[in-house]
Swiss-Prot record:
Name assigned to this protein: Uncharacterized protein in proB 3'region
Residues that coordinate or bind NAD(+): G136, I137, V215, G216, R217, D241, H265, T266, A267, N268
Record EC number: 1.-.-.-
Residue positions of the active site: R217, E246, H265 (proton donor)
Domain of life per record: Bacteria
Source organism per UniProt: Corynebacterium melassecola
Coiled coil (residue ranges): none
Similarity annotation: Belongs to the D-isomer specific 2-hydroxyacid dehydrogenase family.
Pfam families (UniProt xref): 2-Hacid_dh_C
Single GO term (MF): oxidoreductase activity, acting on the CH-OH group of donors, NAD or NADP as acceptor
InterPro entries: D-isomer_DH_CS, D-isomer_DH_NAD-bd, NAD(P)-bd_dom_sf
Keywords: NAD, Oxidoreductase
Length: 304
């Protein structure tokens, strides 16, 4: 098949796809499918010759919101490829927050030691971790959490048991989880139902010692409500790889809070994922040509 890679040329990904016998072309009008690796505003108008779109990201909610995802073409994302990197980054964020790395960095002084001694918490100390959006990344995170002997709660749409979780609840039956968990990890897709799912009401149900981690999408959290909760001691802290707004302005109060750890949307990095997306694309091409559902095909109605 002929493909166009847009808007960025990833040479390592291109080499993998071309190694499978496919040809990269410059003009989208000459292509059978598009490998898209940009932001939503960069998405091009699709001509009728494009049979499917292979997105390089795990979630295409930004494209759905922009209104470009429709049934004119089939769509596939990169779900599953981010499991190892994002799960490892999540462990790092949890530990950095619980071990008060931000407080130590901002203090710039050894005098912060008494504060850390009195307030540092430990993941292995009978903690409960709730994973909201327990798909492929969540399952890998559950595996990485095992050595810490934590109790784990998975929350998903269906309520079907998630491998490795001690308990699983459907989203509409998980209200009690807000008061039960010590650590909340958000890996949800962004939909109308999940937009600002963490807000003043849900934050108010959490333990004062709770830690909130977001490696999903920034707008899952009402940022103003989070700032208030962190200032007022409603929860203990937050660790954020994604924010709303994003990028987070340099003057935003979250940067100066000693109970907040922030990474700039780097729970996964492009360099790590590029070769993997090439291999996934080859698999999806094979399934597409066989008339089967692609391995990571997206329901264009649901958006994931």
């Amino acid at each position: 098949m002929k493909f166009v890679m847009y808007p960025h040329l990833w040479e390592s990904t291109t080499a993998v796809i071309e190694g499978g016998g496919h040809e990269r072309v410059e003009d989208i009008k000459d292509a059978d499918f598009i490998f898209f690796n940009g932001s939503a505003p960069e998405f091009p108008d699709l001509p009728e010759n494009i049979k499917f779109v292979q997105a390089s990201m795990a979630g295409i909610d930004a494209l759905v919101k922009r209104g470009v995802v429709n049934e004119k073409a089939r769509w596939a994302n990169a779900a599953g490829l981010y499991a190892d990197t994002v799960a490892e980054s999540t462990i790092g964020l949890i530990l950095a927050q619980m071990h008060m790395h931000a407080a130590t960095r901002l203090a710039k002084s050894w005098s912060v030691r008494p504060e850390v001694e009195n307030n540092k918490s430990w993941l292995h100390d009978n903690k409960t971790v709730a994973i909201l959006g327990a798909g492929g990344i969540g399952v890998r995170l559950l595996e990485m959490l095992k050595p810490f002997n934590v109790k784990t709660i998975a929350v998903n749409n269906s309520g079907r048991p998630v491998e490795g979780a001690d308990e699983t609840f459907a989203m509409d039956k998980a209200e009690h989880v807000w008061a039960e968990a010590d650590v909340f990890v958000l890996i949800l897709p962004l939909t109308d139902a999940t937009y600002q799912i963490v807000n003043a009401e849900t934050l108010g149900k959490m333990k004062p010692s709770a830690v909130l981690v977001n490696v999903g999408r920034g707008p899952l959290i009402n940022t103003d409500d989070l700032v208030d909760a962190l200032n007022n001691g409603t929860i203990a802290g937050a660790a954020l790889d994604v924010t709303d707004p994003e990028p987070l302005p340099d003057s935003h109060p979250l940067w100066e809070m000693d109970n907040v750890v922030i990474t700039p949307h780097t729970a996964n990095t492009n360099e790590r994922i590029r070769a993997l997306t090439g291999e996934l694309t080859l698999r999806n091409i094979e399934l597409f040509e066989a008339g089967e559902q692609m391995a990571t095909e997206v329901d264009v109605v649901a958006g994931y």
